[in-house]
């Protein structure tokens, strides 16, 4: 019997632990409350810090508690142009400026936003990687929904009351600098997750992987597998409709006027 392959070890009940020892905290907007729904609340950017395992910097914002005499600190992914000592306004009546957190329904079309809520009150899940942003496309006042363009280019409809931070996420251009050597990849993934180095299946022995073995590195059989294959066999091109290079382009159909 062969050994458990990588995809089986990654499944439920895995032995791996999250690399979160030195992380500074989760990136979340402040909890939605009465002050944000009907007005705004002011906060102060205390510090902008590096969070290991995250490409974007984190901003530590101190808000005054609306009900008790104390301050509450939250960690949020920093927007490009945010600085220490800056006042951040959160709420439906906040001004439109970089770093403020407002409902997407109050923003004009074409506004660049980040840290967008998918559901009202989830404290921001969309467009949070370094340099990422979403764009407000259109509003529908009748259904109280807003259409936004995601960083992938896909369009998405969200509730107009969902909050977002104005601006794009700081740390853009991080991936433009090449890693150049294996040591940098080692430290990068040591802070992120246990996914490096990744050994190819054809470089393994036949006991360790369906693609392993042979006097030279080759798969030795078609790499396509059926959809309902067992977990230890389900590697390669899974339920592929077609394989190989896509040769040629899409045929162009001309109208009668263009043929003339």
Curated annotation (Swiss-Prot):
Recorded GO MF terms: RNA binding; rRNA binding; structural constituent of ribosome
Location(s), subcellular: Cytoplasm
Gene3D superfamilies associated with the record: 2.30.30.30, Nucleic acid-binding proteins (2.40.50.140), Ribosomal protein L2, domain 3 (4.10.950.10)
SUPFAM superfamilies documented for this protein: Nucleic acid-binding proteins, Translation proteins SH3-like domain
Entries under InterPro entries matching the protein: NA-bd_OB-fold, Rib_uL2_dom2, Ribosomal_uL2, Ribosomal_uL2_arc_euk, Ribosomal_uL2_C, Ribosomal_uL2_CS, Ribosomal_uL2_dom3, Ribosomal_uL2_RNA-bd_dom
BP terms from Gene Ontology: cytoplasmic translation
Signal peptide extent: none
An annotated GO cellular component: cytosolic large ribosomal subunit
Keywords: Cytoplasm, Ribonucleoprotein, Ribosomal protein, RNA-binding, rRNA-binding
Pfam families: Ribosomal_L2, Ribosomal_L2_C
Predominant location category: cytoplasm
Ribonucleoprotein recorded as keyword: yes
Region (Disordered): 208-230
NCBIfam families tied to this protein: PRK09612.1 (NF007180)
Annotated family: Belongs to the universal ribosomal protein uL2 family.
Name of this protein: Large ribosomal subunit protein uL2
Origin organism lineage: Eukaryota, Metazoa, Ecdysozoa, Nematoda, Chromadorea
